[in-house]
From Swiss-Prot:
This is DNA mismatch repair protein MutS. It comes from Orientia tsutsugamushi (strain Ikeda) (Rickettsia tsutsugamushi). ATP binds at residues 641-648. This protein is involved in the repair of mismatches in DNA. It is possible that it carries out the mismatch recognition step. This protein has a weak ATPase activity. GO terms for biological process: mismatch repair. GO terms for molecular function: ATP binding; ATP-dependent DNA damage sensor activity; damaged DNA binding; mismatched DNA binding.
């Protein structure tokens, strides 16, 4: 950020015209924004903003005269086309400052003479985390703004969705911060600028660098945050909003302060923040969330994700709630079973589901409509949404009453049933005021019924029947003057006037006729009546539009008084949509109700991968189902077998079954018994982290380190090919050690797939580990995958067979077979006579080099994160290699 002096020097402020100086003054206070500067019917951009935006939007880069002897770069956006251009700016993470004219040029001239500059002011800053416009945000996903404060090893996170008036505060361990960020997926993250100098903490936000908004440290001070909260909610003490700790107060205050800056005069009406306990939800680490493709595929697309398969919701708010459910599975038995009861209720009443879905799909996005109404950004359609929702809510309740007794609603259905209400008073008010088939724009009027307001009816009469009023006045004047040829005319110089021929001018004797002009053939007059009519006609359209805005504000106020009930109604409709969706897909895809317990059970019978099943069903193929029983004596399954045989699919499908069960949905299986999983970890697939200079193996080790450090005995751990990114012996050693640690230290349920067949001997050493493999058919050197997981171990990898299926040249395959035979003939016996791998891998450890000792001396192990520790190991390795090279020279 430039100082004012540097800024003015850069843009040669003192050589600028008065209007350009006004632009530069406003731009100085909004240096981080693209400034859209209203000039008449256009938003104009200058200097660097013009260059950036013209390229981004494909606009013509023009020039607006000269400034300081140079062409002034300029491009423009028509004001009526703004909404079509804004999404592309916001999608690119640009902040956009909207600067409007606060007066007309005529008003400016009256105020300060001919050379006066029109008053302008930034009325709003659009950012990706604070927008509410339908055209700028995804309909079926939340749009979160977050603020984070880290104190010791706890991160306080506040996040809100301004478009739906949702506000949540949660504390998590700093070790779980990246997992939580991947769950929330905020569009903007507010951090203290002091974090810019803390590289270890800043590393936690590596994947969110483009979304960070740094604010001065005072934003986060407890005292300032406390005042901000009190002012925002108009309360005397912050105790009114719940038991917030000091860091939670800081994040709430930071969010509210940020909103006050960017929203200017249109302040959001967020509810009190909801304080959430992390223990009630399953933790899904960032890697698992990505690899399981819960809400998007690895390439970032919705199609092909789990969400795309299970989402048959029929409303936008229902789609958003399903997105939240899938991102945040529950981890508390009673809460999960309560949801499953609701799903079961609808599953047992499929005709009701069909009828409700037909009704619910008629409900507009009441949630976001209500939010825009509360922040004075309402469109006419938003009010229509409220009206429609009130009407349909009664029909939904009537439909539910066909299978429920109103006096005896099951407790688990109360949150759905009780908020369904009709408000005749509010409905009648909106129905009497609003026209049908409303447009999105409120600027030009035309959305209020004329019958609603006598004044509006008069103005519209003037607009649409002006010729009739002129004709009436003309006939009146002809009668009064006895001049049958009297006319009422109009031109651009005189406006409206009365005209009579010169020979009839003497007949006009009444003083109300004021002489205006005499021509060679006619004399022109005016009257107070005519001037009043002309003024009304000229201003009628503007006055009607302004009156409609006043009526709109009154209607919004009436809705605001019922906002709490309407918010509960929106939630009820969303829940109905989601649970009807669960019942619908469960019936369509042949899902079963899972049994959720508080123990460590895990017994899936004929489980399926629902995404792949849907994909291959389209090809008229059948999905091969598999059992998975992780009981005490086999809570770790070590799975061997060739690539492409279905190991990874099996791993993923069991994780997906757990997630679906714990969001309250039926699952793709014949039966499922699941002890609640508190954390789900997954290490599947290989990926370099090029941005941070980490190899595939380093990424794998960092992710594995996180899993080993954070898993509990209630977790589900899924590991695929641990150790493959290094030498064979190194890889076997790492995989072996990880298995032992999971078995004996963590003692959790685990699926562990590997190519290291040497590991199968661990089944005789680790009592809770059991070997499983993928069934194949090997006949005459021809390999067929049967995709069935069976007990036992693979005796070879079939890598060359897979290469053959992949289409490698025959000459390469034949040579590979020759080499394989030679290697198998000469390979060392890893297990030796006592089947103990550790003895066969003993190596002589040389003395530590001096530089390595110095590195180790400087370390403080208690302050190292797993990621930092691995980086240091690499540094030590490089140091050893360097010293060995120096000895050889």
């Amino acid at each position: 950020m430039l100082t004012q002096e540097d800024f003015r020097n850069k843009y040669q402020y003192h050589q600028a015209t008065p209007m350009l100086q006004q632009y530069l003054d406003i731009k100085f206070t909004h240096q981080c924004c693209i400034l859209l500067f209203r000039v008449g019917d256009f938003y104009e951009l200058f200097f660097d903003d013009a260059i950036v935006v013209s390229k981004l939007l494909g606009l013509v880069l023009a020039k607006k005269g000269k400034h300081a002897g140079q062409d002034l770069p300029m491009c423009g956006i028509p004001y009526h086309a703004l909404e079509s251009y804004l999404p592309r700016l916001v999608e690119q993470e640009h902040k956009v400052a909207l600067c409007e004219q606060l007066e007309s040029p005529e008003e400016a001239k009256k105020r300060n003479g001919y050379k006066a500059v029109v008053k302008r002011e930034v009325v709003r800053i659009l950012t990706s985390g604070t927008i509410t416009e339908e055209s700028l945000i995804k309909a079926n996903a939340p749009n979160y703004l977050a603020a984070i404060v880290i104190y010791k090893d706890i991160a306080s996170i506040g996040y809100c969705d301004v478009s739906t008036a949702e506000f949540i505060v949660i504390d998590v361990s700093i070790h779980n911060l990246t997992s939580e960020l991947s769950r929330i997926n905020p569009k903007e993250i507010i951090l203290s600028e002091s974090l810019q100098h803390n590289s270890s903490l800043l590393a936690l936000f590596d994947n969110y660098k483009q979304k960070i908004v740094y604010q001065v440290e005072s934003y986060f001070s407890f005292n300032k945050a406390q005042r901000t909260i009190q002012n925002y909610y108009e309360i005397i003490t912050i105790d009114s909003i719940g038991s917030l700790n000091s860091t939670q107060v800081s994040v709430v205050g930071a969010i509210l302060e940020y909103l006050s800056i960017v929203q200017k005069h249109s302040k959001s009406k967020l509810p009190f923040p909801q304080i959430v306990s992390y223990e009630n939800f399953m933790l899904i680490d960032a890697s698992a969330r990505k690899n399981l493709e819960l809400t998007s595929t690895l390439s970032g697309n919705l199609k092909g994700s789990l969400l795309s398969v299970i989402d048959a919701t029929v409303t936008n708010q229902g789609g958003r709630l399903l997105h939240k459910f899938l991102s945040t599975p529950l981890a508390e038995v009673n809460l999960i079973n309560s949801r499953l009861q609701i799903t079961d209720f609808f599953y047992q009443n499929l005709q009701l589901v069909e009828n409700l879905r037909e009704l619910v799909k008629l409900v507009p996005d009441i949630e976001r409509a209500l939010s825009r109404i509360l922040i004075a950004k309402a469109l006419p359609k938003d009010l229509e949404s409220i009206k429609i929702s009130l009407k349909i809510a009664l029909s939904i309740k009537k439909e539910l009453n066909k299978v429920l007794e109103e006096e005896n609603i099951p407790k688990y259905l109360e949150e759905i049933y009780n908020p369904l209400f009709g408000d005749d008073e509010l409905y009648d008010l909106l129905d009497s005021a609003l026209l049908d088939d409303l447009s999105n724009s409120a600027n030009d009027g035309g959305f209020i019924k004329s019958s609603y307001s006598t004044k509006l009816e008069e103005l519209r009469n003037l607009i649409y029947n002006s010729s009739h009023f002129i004709e009436q006045l003309k006939l009146q004047y002809r009668q009064e003057t006895c001049i049958e040829t009297l006319k009422i005319c109009h031109n651009n110089v005189w406006g409206m006037f009365i005209e009579v021929s010169s020979k009839n001018a003497h007949k006009i004797t009444d003083s109300k006729f004021v002489h205006k002009q005499t021509t060679t053939t006619a004399v022109r007059f005016t009257t107070t009546e005519l001037q009043t009519l002309e003024a009304k006609m000229l201003n009628a359209k503007t006055m009607a539009a302004a009156l409609e805005q006043e009526i709109l504000a009154e209607l919004c106020k009436a809705i605001s008084l019922k906002s709490e009930k309407l918010s509960h109604l929106a939630k009820s409709i969303s829940l109905i949509d989601v649970f009807c969706n669960f019942a619908y897909i469960s019936h369509e895809f042949n899902y079963c109700r899972p049994e959720i317990t508080s123990d460590l059970a895990f017994n899936i019978v004929n489980g399926r991968h629902t995404v792949i099943e849907k994909l291959i069903t389209k090809k008229h193929e059948s999905f091969i189902s598999n059992d998975c029983n992780l009981q005490n004596d086999q809570r770790i399954w070590l799975i061997t077998g060739p690539n492409m045989a279905g190991k990874s699919t099996f791993l993923r499908q069991n994780a997906i079954i757990v997630i679906l069960a714990q969001i309250g949905c039926y699952v793709p299986a014949q039966s499922a018994q699941i002890g609640v999983v508190d954390k789900l970890f997954s290490r599947i697939g290989a990926a370099d982290d090029l941005a941070s200079g980490q190899s595939t193996f380093m990424v794998e080790m960092v992710e594995t380190s996180v899993i080993l450090a954070q898993s509990t005995f209630r977790s589900l751990v899924i590991l695929d090919e641990i150790g493959r990114g290094t030498s064979t012996y190194d890889g076997i050693s790492i995989a072996w050690s990880c298995l032992e640690y999971i078995h004996s230290n963590i003692r959790c349920r685990c699926l562990f797939a590997t190519h290291y067949h040497e590991l199968v001997d661990l089944a005789s050493k680790l009592q809770s580990l059991k070997n499983f493999t993928v069934k194949i058919h090997d006949s005459n050197d021809k390999l067929s995958f049967l995709y069935k997981i069976i007990e036992g171990a693979a005796n070879k990898s079939y890598g060359i067979h897979v290469a053959e299926l992949a289409g490698l040249p025959r000459i390469v395959l034949n040579r590979a077979k020759e080499i394989l035979l030679e290697l198998e003939h000469n390979k060392a016996d890893i297990n030796q006579s006592n089947n103990n791998i550790t003895k066969s891998m003993d190596i002589a450890v040389p003395p530590y080099p001096v530089k390595t000792i110095e590195i180790i001396k400087q370390l403080n192990p208690d302050q190292l994160t797993p990621k930092e520790a691995l980086s240091i190991i690499y540094k030590i390795k490089n140091t050893i290699l360097l010293e060995e090279d120096e000895k050889m020279i």
